[in-house]
A protein has these predicted regions:
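Alpha-helical transmembrane segments and their membrane-interface boundaries
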Residues: 1-110, 114-233, 237-253, 257-270, ...
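Short glycine/proline-centered loop/turn elements that form peptide/ligand docking sites
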Residues: 274
Length: 325
């Protein structure tokens, strides 16, 4: 019972901290920039423990590079036609992968690429963008301080430049970079060409399914599709049953659920709450749910298909057998 109480305390403590950080950013930068708080929060939580596989002092350069992309990339991609945005996404996501994801087991892509997609999906202009830049710069400084404090004794000898010098298409790690970059960018391109809203949803779905090891992708794709449907059904029931005054708290309920979820499946279920609570207000419940289910099912299937196709193309061009484990 004592361990359960401690666990519950930790979950709620983290939740309170997360809500406080996002609220502070929203108050200072405006509600349109609450996503900045989410992006910085995710980075802080990761950089407390994760590293980049290079010297700590050079890791600070990676953080600066990552935040430079988060500041410029999403805004630029929203200013140009779909094909130009596709090229910008290719460059930005690839750089995020190279600078932030060398240590594959840290799963840093689920933080930095996710932040990029969120900032792109919740775009702002004018004074709001100026405030966004200020917020991200402050977040960068906070992340650098926390990262250096926690990681300064790491024994790595690899440098920031080595992340680029060591790039090799025959490396399984670098092929994963290419796969994820192409799959996410091309999926969003199709959404933009079809003039469908929430292109970031399919980008996030593809990113989540495109794991470093191909053998893991099929299982992840099935869970992504199936448990998004479960999440949408639960959300729909809550949205219909609860009074409108409770709608703003559905996302928070999802956050608590994620905190209690030990596995990917139920994390996927509860992650739908926050996304749909916003989309349902914009598009209506029916369209938002159908869009969410369709985008995630198609995105998961598309990622699985592209992963196998890219491996076959690589094997045919190089004569090398692709390792799946």
């Amino acid at each position: 019972r004592k361990h359960i109480l401690i666990y519950n305390f930790k979950v709620y403590l983290v939740m309170v901290f997360c809500v406080a950080v996002v609220t502070i950013f929203s108050k200072l930068l405006g509600s349109a920039n609450s996503v900045v708080g989410v992006t910085v929060l995710l980075a802080v939580l990761v950089l407390r423990q994760a590293d980049f596989g290079i010297k700590t002092s050079h890791g600070l350069l990676s953080i600066m590079g990552i935040y430079a992309i988060l500041i410029a990339g999403p805004r630029l991609s929203n200013m140009v036609p779909p094909f130009a945005a596709f090229l910008i996404n290719i460059v930005c996501i690839m750089l995020l992968m190279i600078m932030g994801c060398h240590n594959v087991i840290m799963y840093n892509h689920s933080t930095f690429v996710l932040g990029y997609l969120l900032l792109q999906g919740y775009d702002v202009t004018g004074q709001d963008y100026v405030l966004r830049v200020i917020g991200l710069l402050c977040g960068m400084v906070i992340c650098m301080i926390i990262f250096y404090k926690n990681q300064k004794n790491r024994p790595y000898r690899r440098t920031f430049q080595d992340l680029f010098y060591e790039f090799n298409i025959n490396s399984a790690r670098n092929r994963w970079y290419i796969k994820l970059t192409f799959i996410v960018s091309s999926a969003m391109l199709v959404m933009n060409l079809l003039n469908m809203p929430r292109a970031m949803w399919i980008g996030i779905a593809c990113m989540s399914v495109c794991l470093p090891f191909s053998k893991d992708i099929e299982g992840r794709a099935g869970k992504r599709g199936a448990f998004n449907i479960v999440g949408c059904l639960i959300f729909s029931i809550m949205y219909i049953v609860l009074p409108k005054s409770m709608y703003p708290y559905i996302g928070m309920i999802g956050g608590i659920g994620v905190g209690y979820s030990a596995g990917y499946s139920w994390q996927t279920v509860f992650n739908t709450f926050g996304a749909l609570s916003i989309a349902a207000e914009l598009f209506g419940l029916k369209y938002a749910v159908l869009l969410r289910i369709g985008v995630n099912v198609v995105g998961a299937a598309y990622t699985l298909l592209c992963d196998r196709l890219i491996d076959k193309i690589y094997a045919a061009c190089t004569g090398r057998k692709v390792e799946t484990a």
